[in-house]
Amino acid sequence: MVDPLCNYNVLESIFSYLELNDLNRCSQVCKSWYHFLNDENSDVWRWHCLRKLPKEAVKSDLLSSVTTYKTKLRAYLHAWSPNDCSRNVYVKPNGFTLHRNPVAQSTDAARGKIGFRHGRHAWEVIWEGPLGTVAVIGISTKEAALQCHGYVALLGSDDQSWGWNLVENHLLHNGDTQGSYPLLNNAPKYQVGERIRVILDCDDNTLSFEKNYEFLGVAFRGLPDKKLYPTVSAVYGNTEVSMVYLGTPLDG
């Protein structure tokens, strides 16, 4: 009779050296392998997490909302793309935070590595430096511009992007202000360091936001059937913005 512990150790050793796409296929082979890989804090996920994530990120307070090795790894794979941002922006070594260089008369944006066309998705955005005159968070397609001259609300300036300007509490799309947001009397302004949760529902074609665990309402409806990416645009020199992908949002 084979010792179950022996089987466990063998699987652990094999799965630790597979690529992530292969792990997904393995989880569909049988119930035993599914349950094995369903443990998000197992040594397999720990191994993959520590191998891919920068050391400074794994135990950072930035990832306090993603508590397992698997969800930390997933957040990293969805973080800002160093290849899909303005030339005046770079992604810091932690992999989750972008830094805007102090370039005069420029507005600069960045997109996440992975876009969404189906399902429901949530991520947190944390503005960790001054907002400046314009600071916009939201979504865009691949066609939306990532840099322009002047200090403007770049995200939301065309029909390929949708944004919330945190400075003025305005919604922006197609170059127009779509109204105030949230719809509250004397709505409080964003404070640097607050976590804003962005909720994209590709099934219902809506974009919503939460702040301090309070749902602020639906911001945009009728989103197109296109792949949409987490996006921000900034104007302030040396400001920094972090993004942490959370997965499917919890209702209630």
Curated annotation (Swiss-Prot):
Residues 58-250 form the B30.2/SPRY domain. Keywords: Neurogenesis, Synapse, Ubl conjugation pathway. It is found in: Synapse. GO terms for biological process: negative regulation of gene expression; negative regulation of synaptic assembly at neuromuscular junction; neuromuscular synaptic transmission; positive regulation of protein catabolic process; proteasome-mediated ubiquitin-dependent protein catabolic process; protein ubiquitination; synapse assembly involved in innervation. One of its GO terms (cellular component) is nucleus. It comes from the Eukaryota. SUPFAM superfamilies: Concanavalin A-like lectins/glucanases, F-box domain. Signal peptide: none annotated. Disulfide bonds: none annotated. Pfam families: F-box-like (PF12937), SPRY (PF00622). Pathway: Protein modification; protein ubiquitination. Residues 1-48 form the F-box domain. InterPro entries: B30.2/SPRY (IPR001870), B30.2/SPRY_sf (IPR043136), ConA-like_dom_sf (IPR013320), F-box-like_dom_sf (IPR036047), F-box_dom (IPR001810), FBXO45-Fsn/SPSB_families (IPR050672), SPRY_dom (IPR003877), SPRY_FBXO45 (IPR035784). Belongs to the FBXO45/Fsn family. Component of an E3 ubiquitin ligase complex composed of hiw and Fsn. Required in the presynaptic motoneuron to down-regulate the levels of wnd and restrain synaptic terminal growth at the neuromuscular junction (NMJ). This is F-box/SPRY domain-containing protein 1.
